[in-house]
């Protein structure tokens, strides 16, 4: 698949192999023991987060300040964009209103961290979900009720902290459908009763939304193209500029074309 480890992490071994090939005049290949591979390659950025949040007795947020510090390791790699994306996802599906979000890229004496599934998004979302849990605990409310109260609206309270209007918002309907189909309220009551009777073994149940941005902050990358030929027998020939590396791109593009010509 098109995962982040393929972006920059191959550069080191490629350079080492190039040096060997240059000096020996022969093809070179590097095969690392798993222990060395795991020690030297980048992982997901650990984050340290501090926040101050203001909310009313219902759990509605009125203001938040958040500092996100990413452990980048010894080199920048892709940490700039990763911390950016963490900042952009520190709202998840919630209207923050008066928000100040600061991102810090921290150089540390560790292996350089790199692109990893979510690319900073999960770290930002985990931070705001902790805020929602903390607000719910403070007020003694069901965390899901606090989350629903702070969801983005459809026509109001629908602009992100980076000034983008949230369109096609179906989070309210999705949550209602999932609450019913998963029997959330019933199961949560049962879990609370179980925990009260069980001094050691505990259970938990939570429902959290996800709003994930799919574009690049380098806006020129947000483009694609395809060439389609329609033949007299009704068949369609499709060419596109993407690279199929296991992520199922050819199938997905074919589905888009089928939808357009439906």
Q: Which ranges hold each PLM region?
A:
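Helix-loop-helix junctions that connect adjacent transmembrane helices in secondary transporters/permeases
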Residues: 151-235
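Glycine-rich loop/linker segments at domain edges
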Residues: 46-131, 213-221
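Alpha-helical support elements that line or immediately flank enzyme active sites
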Residues: 2-24, 81-91, 115-150, 162, ...
């Amino acid at each position: 698949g098109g995962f982040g480890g393929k972006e920059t992490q191959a550069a080191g071994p490629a350079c080492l192999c190039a040096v060997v090939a240059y000096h020996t005049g022969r093809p070179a290949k590097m095969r690392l023991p798993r222990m060395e591979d795991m020690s030297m390659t980048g992982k997901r950025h650990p984050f340290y987060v501090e926040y101050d949040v203001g909310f009313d007795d219902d759990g509605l947020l009125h203001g938040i300040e958040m500092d996100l510090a990413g452990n980048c390791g010894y080199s920048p790699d892709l940490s700039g964009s990763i911390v950016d994306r963490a900042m952009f996802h520190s709202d998840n599906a919630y209207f923050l209103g008066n928000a100040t979000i600061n991102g810090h890229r921290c150089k540390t004496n560790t292996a350089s961290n790199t692109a990893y599934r979510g690319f900073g998004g999960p770290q930002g979302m985990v931070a705001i979900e902790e805020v929602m849990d903390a607000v719910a605990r403070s007020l003694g409310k069901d965390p899901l009720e606090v989350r629903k109260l702070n969801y983005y609206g459809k026509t109001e309270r629908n602009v992100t902290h980076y000034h983008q209007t949230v369109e096609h918002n179906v989070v309210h309907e999705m949550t209602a459908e999932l609450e019913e189909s998963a029997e959330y309220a019933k199961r949560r009551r049962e879990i609370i009763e179980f925990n009260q009777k069980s001094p050691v073994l505990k259970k938990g149940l939570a429902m959290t939304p996800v709003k994930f941005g799919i574009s690049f902050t380098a806006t020129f990358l947000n483009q694609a193209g395809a060439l389609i030929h329609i033949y007299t027998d009704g068949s369609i020939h499709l060419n596109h500029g993407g690279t199929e590396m296991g992520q199922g791109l050819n199938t997905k593009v074919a589905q888009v074309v089928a939808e357009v010509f439906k």
